[in-house]
Structure formats: C-alpha cells, structure tokens
Amino acid sequence: MDTNEGDVRFENEGSLEPLPVVRERTVVMRAVGLTKIYAAVSSGGGSGRGALELFRGLDLKVHAGEMVAIVGESGAGKSSLLHLLAALDTPTAGEVWCGETRLSSFTPKQAADYRNRDVGYVWQFHYLLPEFSAQENVAMPLLARGTRRAEAMERAAYWLGEVGLADRADHRSGELSGGEQQRVSLARALVTEPKILLADEPTGDLDGKTAETVFGLIQRLHEVHGLTSVLVTHSLEFAGRCGRVLRLREGRLVDATLESKP
C-alpha cells in the first residue's frame, strides 16, 4: 500500500533552470497511413489463420506543446500504437515521422539512439534496476550515451527533485513505494530532455490517490517544462484533463475531446 503519495515536495529552487516552454505549433510527430497486423501463430510455431489487424491507414499529428490522451477499449491497439511511435516495433505499412526523421529508415542502433535522444518512455511497470539507487536508475540513459558520470548524476539529481524525490536518491527501488517507483521512472524518461514524452498507462498499476499524484505530476512537468506528451490511459477522468483526446476505435483515431471533458 502506497503512503504519503499526496505529500510531494519539489526542491529545485536555485538549481538547474527548467527547459524553455515551447509555444510553436510545429508538428513534432506524425503517423501517415499506419497499419499494424499481427500474423497468427499456429501451435507448431508456424504461420496460422486469423491474423489480428489492429489498425489500417491510421493518421496522427502531434504538435509541439500538446498533451494528447489516447483512449479506447482493451485490445484496441493503444499500446501497440505507442510502441510504433517509439520505434519499439515496426508497422506493417505506413510511416512514423519524428520531425523530419522517418523511423522506418532506422537500423537497430539508430532506433536505440532515437529512444535515448528524442523520446522519453514511461511504462505501466517501472522497470527500475533493483541493484541500483534511484539516482543511478535515472542517470542510466545518460550513462548509456557516454555522458560523464558526474554530469549524469547531477542531471539525475535535478530530475529527482522535479518529481519530489530528492530525499530518496540513495534508495533502491525495493525501498520505494509503488508511486515513488513510477515517479523515478518518469524522471528517468525526462533526464535526456526528449522531444516527446510517451506514457503507456502510467497510472494503471496505482491506487486512486497515488494515481492522482502521479498524473498531476505529469501535468505539472508538462506545463513547467513545455513538454510534448502523448499518454495512453484507461481513465476518462485523466484523459479529460489533457488538451486533446483521441479514441482508438475500429482501427481509426477519432477526436473525442469534447465528450471527454467534464
């Protein structure tokens, strides 16, 4: 059971400056004619019948500074769509662009570099490395790209402060509550100062009060740091607090912003 998740203190006054707020309406990410079909696998391991088509000809534009929620029924393909935007998977047809970069042109190394440089990804489960401290976990993406350890740890300390966990920097993941673990994973996603934040059900494993704290924190960071954010969520309440709501229905994204507002 998470405790004290509503009491989040931020301790970065006088430390590193927040990122400038982005005000242009530049298209940061777009998907054009996106199709994803999973081939069925037979019990013998070969191809079987009944392939699963999640979407066909799907289009999406995300503008700088937007906070976009994607909602839909279970199995509609929300997480699969986010995986395509993060180059964690490849589409059957169509293209995903981040700025002027076409993701389908990536080699595996380029895809990994893209995820380290341009995209911050928050999973439903935190995936923190248990043998390392919270600060070391947050620093990992910077260390992976060759940043000096002292600089990486300084940036990690800053982002832990931004998620209200400056006093938990030396704690390992097993010593943190569920909400604290997810806040560490959020800091890890943002430590590289990505062009876009992708979050896949970031509150899905949390109880009501803790989920509110984590979602409120995402909102705060989005506004303070001028982020561009795309969130998959099953919570219509949280979705309604985003600037734009898209519903994935029958393989298409439809604007559901008005119906999602309270």
Regions found by a protein language model. Name each.
Residues 245-258:
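H-loop (His-switch) and adjacent beta-strand-loop-beta switch element
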Residues 27-241, 245-248:
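ABC family nucleotide-binding domain
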Residues 1-37, 255-262:
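ABC-family P-loop ATPase nucleotide-binding domain
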